[in-house]
Amino acid sequence: RPSFNSWG
């Protein structure tokens, strides 16, 4: 879950 996506 990388921080650039909506879930991370």
Swiss-Prot record:
Sequence positions bearing Glycine amide: G8
GO cellular component: extracellular region
GO biological process, one term: neuropeptide signaling pathway
Keyword entries, A-Z: Amidation, Neuropeptide, Secreted
Chief location bin: secreted
Domain of life: Eukaryota
Location in the cell: Secreted
Function: Mediates visceral muscle contractile activity (myotropic activity).
Family indicated by similarity: Belongs to the kinin family.
Protein name: Kinin-1
